[in-house]
UniProtKB/Swiss-Prot annotation:
GO terms for biological process: glycolytic process; lactate metabolic process. It comes from Lactobacillus acidophilus (strain ATCC 700396 / NCK56 / N2 / NCFM). CDD domains: HicDH_like (cd05291). PANTHER family: L-2-HYDROXYCARBOXYLATE DEHYDROGENASE (NAD(P)(+)) (PTHR43128), L-LACTATE DEHYDROGENASE (PTHR43128:SF16). Pathway: Fermentation; pyruvate fermentation to lactate; (S)-lactate from pyruvate: step 1/1. This is L-lactate dehydrogenase 2. Belongs to the LDH/MDH superfamily. LDH family. Catalyzes the conversion of lactate to pyruvate. Keywords: Cytoplasm, NAD, Oxidoreductase. GO terms for molecular function: L-lactate dehydrogenase activity.
Length: 308
C-alpha cells in the first residue's frame, strides 16, 4: 500500500484535516485538489514545514488524474452552511459540486475508498455511491460521528468525568432528525440512567445543546472544522493502517432497523483498510426505532427531490 490520500476541498475543513492527518499517522503522499488553484500550492508548502516532526510525506497540489493510485479519496468540498441554514438547505448546491468531483475521480482509475464529509453528509454519501457505481462498502460518510463526540463532551461535563469514560452515540441523520441512543449509553461502564444527576429533563437539555452546538459555532466563528477534521483523521488513519475501529458513520442501510430505503444513514460501523467491514444494527427501543425510521424517511424524501 502506498499510503496515498487524495483530498478534494482545501478550505477550512480540508486544510485542518490535512494537518491533523500528517500528525496522527504515516502518509507517503498527500495530493490536494481545490478549484481555487493557489490554495493547495500554499498549503502544500505550509504543510511541508511540519514534516521534520511528522515524517517524510510528498505533499503537492493535484489534478483529478492524481487520484488514480490513491488509497483514499476524501471529499470535503462544498458550499459551507451559513448562520440560520440547515444542512439540508445545502442539498442541490452541493449535489452539483459532488458530481463534478466523483465523475473525474472515477475516470482517473481510482480504486480506493471514498470518505465524504461535505453536507448534507448522508445525502452526499448516498449519491457518491450511486454516481461512482462503487461497491457500498467502499463509500463512507462521517455521519453522526461528530454529533456523538459532542454528546460525549456534554455528558462528561455534566457528570464531571473524563470524556474517555463516556460511551454514547447519536444515530440517524447528521442533522435535525438525529437522536441520542441514551438507553445504551454508559459512563465508566455504568448505565447512564443509573447516575443520580441524570433524568429526562437533563437528557432533553443535553440533546438540545448537542443539536444546537454546530449552529452556535458557525454564528460565532463562521464555520466548524476542528471536530470534523479530527473525525476524518480517525477514519482515514484506520483505513491506511488497516485497523478495525467502530464509529457511528454514514453507512449503507440494508433493511436494518426496518428501514425500506436504499440510502446511507448514521449507525455504528466497523471500518478497516478495505472500507466498511460491518454495519451494526444497534439495540434500540421502539421509540428510538421509530426515530431512526423517521430519519430515513426524511432522507429519502430529500433524495427523491434531488436535481442531478
Amino acid at each position: 500500500m502506498s499510503r496515498k490520500v487524495f483530498l478534494v476541498g482545501d478550505g477550512a475543513v480540508g486544510s485542518t484535516f490535512a494537518n491533523d492527518l500528517l500528525q496522527n499517522t504515516t502518509v507517503d503522499e498527500l495530493a490536494i485538489f481545490d478549484v481555487a488553484k493557489d490554495r493547495p500550492v500554499g498549503d502544500s508548502m505550509d504543510l511541508e514545514d511540519i514534516t521534520p516532526f511528522t515524517g517524510q510525506t510528498n505533499i503537492h497540489p493535484a489534478e483529478y488524474s492524481d487520484a488514480k493510485d490513491a488509497d483514499v479519496c476524501v471529499i470535503t468540498a462544498g458550499v459551507p452552511r451559513k448562520p440560520g441554514e440547515t444542512r439540508l438547505d445545502l442539498v442541490n448546491k452541493n449535489v452539483k459540486i459532488l458530481k463534478t468531483i466523483v465523475d473525474p475521480v472515477v475516470e482517473s482509475g481510482f480504486k480506493g475508498v471514498f470518505v465524504v464529509s461535505a453536507n448534507p453528509v448522508d445525502i452526499l454519501t448516498t449519491l457518491t455511491q450511486k454516481i461512482s457505481g462503487f461497491p457500498k462498502d467502499r463509500v463512507i460518510g462521517t455521519g453522526t460521528s461528530l454529533d456523538s463526540m459532542r454528546l460525549r463532551v456534554e455528558l462528561a461535563k455534566k457528570l464531571n468525568v473524563p470524556v474517555a469514560k463516556v460511551n454514547s452515540m447519536v444515530l440517524g441523520e447528521h442533522g435535525d432528525t438525529s437522536f441520542e441512543n441514551f438507553d445504551e449509553s454508559t459512563v465508566d461502564n455504568k448505565p447512564l440512567r443509573d447516575y443520580s444527576e441524570i433524568n429526562d429533563n437533563v437528557l432533553s437539555e443535553i440533546e438540545s445543546d448537542v443539536r444546537k452546538k454546530g449552529g452556535k459555532i458557525i454564528t460565532n466563528k463562521g464555520a466548524t472544522f476542528y471536530g470534523v477534521a479530527m473525525m476524518l483523521t480517525q477514519i482515514v488513519s484506520a483505513i491506511l493502517d488497516n485497523r478495525s475501529i467502530c464509529l457511528p458513520l454514514s453507512a449503507p442501510i440494508n433493511g436494518e432497523y426496518g428501514i425500506k430505503h436504499d440510502l446511507y444513514l448514521g449507525t455504528p460501523t466497523i471500518i478497516n483498510g478495505n472500507g466498511i467491514e460491518k454495519v451494526i444494527e444497534t439495540k434500540l427501543s421502539d421509540v428510538e426505532k421509530a426515530k431512526m425510521i423517521n430519519s430515513a424517511d426524511k432522507m429519502q424524501e430529500v433524495l427523491s427531490g434531488v436535481e442531478m
